[in-house]
Amino acid sequence: MPVGVPKVPFRAPGDEDATWVDLYNRLYRERLLFLAQDINHEIANQLMGLMVYLSAEDANKDIFSFINCPGGSVIPGVGLFDMMQVIVPNVHTICMGVAASMGSFILIGGEITKRMALPHARVMIHQPASSYYDGPAAEFHNEAKHITMLRNYITKCYIERTDNPEEVIQRDLDRDVFMSATEARAYGIVDTVAEG
């Protein structure tokens, strides 16, 4: 029997009685966001909407983004990364489990000095990939140009946010590079590893 999303009590300011809300809504009210699936347009839009709402609600309170993400689509991932850069509150990123591919890109998008990995978390970086394209060659050429442009942007972000030289980032994005939490800290993807 599926459990579903648990309900927890929540008392809004000024209310006498608590109401039951699903766990994630309760956590969102505390500015705690979760990316726990492949990144797609739907989850990216939900998280970006929550970030805008929380920023408008109180621009002085930090937002915490917990990441256990095996990757996902490049365009929604880049949109989520960009949103993290433009909202006023600092966004803490916390890797719990795995941050692979686009998940690692979101992880580096946290406020520098506020990016963390749990002790047994794993990080994987690689270049953005195109899906197999079965269409006219001219359209494939356009997609290849777009993927190259995205790769250049992602490379630039890794260089800026990890403080590694371009040749290191270029080399490491050419293949799957897996890291422990400690290795991710040494690489500059996270700033701290939680004590465990």
From Swiss-Prot:
Pfam families named in the record: CLP_protease
InterPro entries associated with the record: ClpP (IPR001907), ClpP/crotonase-like_dom_sf (IPR029045), ClpP/TepA (IPR023562), ClpP_His_AS (IPR033135), ClpP_Ser_AS (IPR018215)
GO molecular function, one term: serine-type endopeptidase activity
GO BP annotations listed: protein quality control for misfolded or incompletely synthesized proteins
Keywords in alphabetical order: Chloroplast, Hydrolase, Plastid, Protease, Serine protease
Active-site feature positions: 101, 126
Catalytic activity from the UniProt record: Hydrolysis of proteins to small peptides in the presence of ATP and magnesium. alpha-casein is the usual test substrate. In the absence of ATP, only oligopeptides shorter than five residues are hydrolyzed (such as succinyl-Leu-Tyr-|-NHMec, and Leu-Tyr-Leu-|-Tyr-Trp, in which cleavage of the -Tyr-|-Leu- and -Tyr-|-Trp bonds also occurs)
E.C. number: 3.4.21.92
Protein localization: Plastid, Chloroplast stroma
GO CC annotation: chloroplast stroma; endopeptidase Clp complex
Subunit architecture: Component of the chloroplastic Clp protease core complex.
Functional summary from the UniProt entry: Cleaves peptides in various proteins in a process that requires ATP hydrolysis. Has a chymotrypsin-like activity. Plays a major role in the degradation of misfolded proteins.
Family in the record: Belongs to the peptidase S14 family.
Protein name, UniProt field: ATP-dependent Clp protease proteolytic subunit
